[in-house]
């Protein structure tokens, strides 16, 4: 029996990161977490490209451009959508998650969804490096593992 499991080694891998600028005080912490993870696992700064977009809604389009460029072993999507008093949250969070999943499936490149979708600012802060860890770090870890797994399966 052969078991496939992606290694947690980023040496030689190239990563694209798409960052939604809206709620930047939260998203900047997600980006720091992602970069920390990639570097700790052997990624070189020259193998990491960061692209800023206005907000989470724009993430799928740029993640598609990055994934289909074939320059990256994985693309990491970072953003923060925080519920307000209108249905805007539901539209944005739903479309971003669907869009990112679609890009990953169509491109055959791991496109990792690390966009926070929280009910309030406190939950976002908790997931950006305090009580609940850092979802940017977690997303980078998933990107490393999936990039290696794809290589293993090819």
UniProtKB/Swiss-Prot annotation:
Report whether Transport shows up as a keyword of the record. no
* Keywords for the protein's UniProt record, in alphabetical order: Riboflavin biosynthesis, Transferase
Highest taxon of the source? Bacteria
Q: Which reaction does it catalyse?
A: (2S)-2-hydroxy-3-oxobutyl phosphate + 5-amino-6-(D-ribitylamino)uracil = 6,7-dimethyl-8-(1-D-ribityl)lumazine + phosphate + 2 H2O + H(+)
Q: Where does 5-amino-6-(D-ribitylamino)uracil bind?
A: 22, 56-58, 80-82, 113
Which top EC class is named for this enzyme in its record? transferase
Q: Which GO terms describe its cellular component?
A: cytosol; riboflavin synthase complex
Pathway per its UniProt entry is: Cofactor biosynthesis; riboflavin biosynthesis; riboflavin from 2-hydroxy-3-oxobutyl phosphate and 5-amino-6-(D-ribitylamino)uracil: step 1/2
Active site per UniProt: 88 (proton donor)
> Which Pfam families does the UniProt record give?
DMRL_synthase
What are the recorded Gene Ontology BP terms?
Answer: riboflavin biosynthetic process
- GO-annotated molecular function: 6,7-dimethyl-8-ribityllumazine synthase activity
Question: PANTHER family under this entry?
Answer: 6,7-DIMETHYL-8-RIBITYLLUMAZINE SYNTHASE, 6,7-DIMETHYL-8-RIBITYLLUMAZINE SYNTHASE DMRL SYNTHASE LUMAZINE SYNTHASE
The record's comment on protein family reads:
Belongs to the DMRL synthase family.
So what does this one do?
Catalyzes the formation of 6,7-dimethyl-8-ribityllumazine by condensation of 5-amino-6-(D-ribitylamino)uracil with 3,4-dihydroxy-2-butanone 4-phosphate. This is the penultimate step in the biosynthesis of riboflavin.
Q: Which protein, by its recorded name, is this?
A: 6,7-dimethyl-8-ribityllumazine synthase
Q: Which gene encodes it?
A: ribH
